[in-house]
Every structure is written in C-alpha cells, then in structure tokens.
Amino acid sequence: MPISLEHVSFTYMKGTPFEKTALHDVNLQIEKGEFVAVIGHTGSGKSTLVQHLSGLLHPQKGSVCVDGVNLNAKNAAAKKARNSVGMVFQYPEHQIFAETVYEDIAFGPRNKGLTPEETDRAVKDAMAFAGLDFETFAQRSPFRLSGGQMRRVAIAGVVAMEPDYLILDEPSAGLDPRARDGIFKEIMALYCKRGIAVILVTHNM
C-alpha cells in the first residue's frame, strides 16, 4: 500500500494579510520501494509537502493516507501508520536532543516498545549503517560533533525505527562535498538493502 495525497491544500496564516498558499489541490502517490525526488526552489512548498506525508502537518483540504489509513484519524491505526514514516529534517539540531549519541538514537526504538536488548541491537545496527563507530561515538554528545556527523546521528535515529518510508529534507544542506557524498552513499545503500521508499527533498539536481 502507498502513501497517497488526494486534493491536499494548505495555506499558512490563512485569513491574514500574510496569507501564503503552500499547497493547492495536490495529488500524489508513493509506493513502497520507490525512490522519489521532490525538487523545487526555496519557498516552493517542498518541506510543507513532506511534513504532510509524515503527519506533522494536517491538510486544510483533502486527505493523506499511509497504507490506507488516514493520518488525521486519532486512533491506534493512525499512530501505527505515522510510525511507519521516518523523517530527517534539513538541520539535524532540530531533532537531536539527548545527552549522548546512544540515547538519541535509542529514543525511537524505546518508544516503539522494544526491549533493552532489542534497542541496543537497533542502535548498534543503525550506527554501523550510518558510519558511526560505536565505541568512538556512542557516549559522545551529539552537539559536539561536526555537521556531517550530526546528520549521520539524525539518520541513524530514524533508521533505528525501521520505517517503511524515509523522508529526507535537504539531507546535504550545509555539508562539504565529501560529507555530502558520504550521506548520499548511505541513503542509497539503505534503499538498496531494505527496499524501503525514499522521498528525497532537494532544491537542485
């Protein structure tokens, strides 16, 4: 089953002099296993779109469904559907909060109800995938890492949740060419290995 948007519209500060329409009558379907790029200039509504896909924003008109479940619903099925979508924000400091890298990555698996042993395994697997050596980084503060390393922590935190859909909002923003290439290699490796859907937001090709 896909993520589907049907006739979705969203306007910021509606009814004020600063009203700005970000989405107007958008229809979109993303199947599991697809790699989709959302490309547009700054301010074109890309981030607004993917925040609807992840359930962070709700449409003012239309509907967003994940695997046939409306994300606007307030029930266990909608919560499970939202948990199947992982999102890495443009700037990792927006979603990194714990005192150590380990605790930050472990937050999601614990929230899903995994046992301590399962959580530990999920953290180690996610760190290995993201290119973060466990012994070197597990007990370090994520806020003392480089931009590229912080981005890897953010990606590892989402990967540890094992989402069916992974949204990456400008994952290479602010990174040097080497770090950018490394991030994209990891994204492609995850896509090829797990067969999840990847939605990549960018302002350039």
Tell where the protein language model's regions lie, with residue ranges.
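The feature captures the beta-strand-to-loop junction immediately N-terminal to the Walker
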Residues: 39-41
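Helix-to-loop junction immediately C-terminal to a conserved catalytic motif
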Residues: 54
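ABC ATPase NBD Q-loop/coupling interface
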Residues: 63-80
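Conserved ABC ATPase signature
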Residues: 141-145, 149
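Hydrophobic anchor residue at the start of the ABC signature
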Residues: 155-156
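Conserved catalytic motifs of ABC-family nucleotide-binding domains
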Residues: 162
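Catalytic Walker B motif of ABC-type/P-loop ATPase nucleotide-binding domains
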Residues: 166-169
